[in-house]
């Protein structure tokens, strides 16, 4: 008897969809729905707050802080220079972002004229030399400085694969370990930013400003493995 492969494929697809639905997979939503408040407020400028570091890796804070400027600018936002911002915040004894994440952000709107403040919380940061991996977990919270409403909130749990492939298994292990050990800390931060900020709606200075509302929003919590 001739097998109807199209019918079989359709049946498998429908069965898989049913399984995913029964496991609680949420239906996709548009960016306009996921980030309704951001589209409503249309922030033009962003103040990047010093990261909140929950790990024992002191270097993680600087790496994340230094890696956020360019991705936000490329998304069409005016971003206050992190270096100047940090100096100003330190002069006002305001460089501890943890103090402000749940407090009023109006002073940042009045003093710095920033429309929004970006908080990042570093939850995991470690290198595993033998596995040639860098593991990074960061939460991103963009809040309005006018009314403290959350405009964008996502988290990334990223494993950066630094492995190197040769024709020798032992050499692979050694070279990969060295590659991981020498990897700049900023590599992990950049990969996490890539995962999360690519889903941020475009700002006024980007070509798709207010044209990306119908695009499907990415998941709130992203986990994955990327090559270095």
How does the language model describe each region?
Residues 2-12:
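Bacterial N-terminal signal peptides that target proteins for export
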Residues 96-151, 158-165, 172, 212-228:
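Surface-exposed short loop/turn segments
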Residues 43, 55-119, 149, 181:
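N-terminal segment of the mature soluble domain
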Residues 19-22:
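C-terminal motif of bacterial Sec signal peptides marking the signal peptidase cleavage site
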Residues 53-56, 126:
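Short histidine/acidic/glycine/proline-rich micro-motifs that form metal-
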Residues 24-42, 146-228:
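C-terminal/domain-edge helix-coil "capping" segments
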């Amino acid at each position: 008897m001739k097998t109807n492969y199209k019918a079989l494929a359709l049946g498998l697809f429908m069965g898989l969809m049913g399984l995913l639905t029964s496991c609680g997979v949420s239906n996709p939503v548009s960016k306009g729905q996921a980030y309704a408040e951001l589209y409503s407020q249309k922030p033009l400028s962003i103040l990047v707050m010093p990261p909140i570091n929950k790990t024992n890796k002191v270097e993680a804070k600087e790496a994340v802080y230094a890696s956020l400027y360019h991705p936000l600018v490329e998304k069409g936002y005016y971003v206050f220079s992190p270096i100047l911002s940090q100096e100003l915040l330190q002069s006002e004894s305001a460089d501890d972002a943890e103090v402000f994440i749940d407090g009023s952000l109006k002073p940042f709107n009045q003093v710095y004229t920033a429309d929004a403040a970006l908080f990042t919380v570093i939850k995991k940061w470690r290198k595993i030399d033998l596995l040639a991996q860098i593991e990074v977990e960061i939460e991103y919270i963009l809040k309005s400085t006018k009314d403290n409403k959350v405009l964008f909130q996502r988290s990334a749990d990223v494993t950066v694969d630094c492995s190197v492939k040769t024709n020798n298994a032992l050499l692979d292990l050694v070279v990969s370990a060295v590659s991981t050990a020498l990897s700049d800390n900023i590599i992990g931060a950049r990969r996490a930013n890539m995962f999360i900020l690519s889903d941020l709606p475009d700002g006024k200075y980007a070509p798709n400003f207010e044209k990306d509302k119908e695009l499907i929003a990415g998941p709130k919590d992203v986990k994955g493995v990327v090559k270095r």
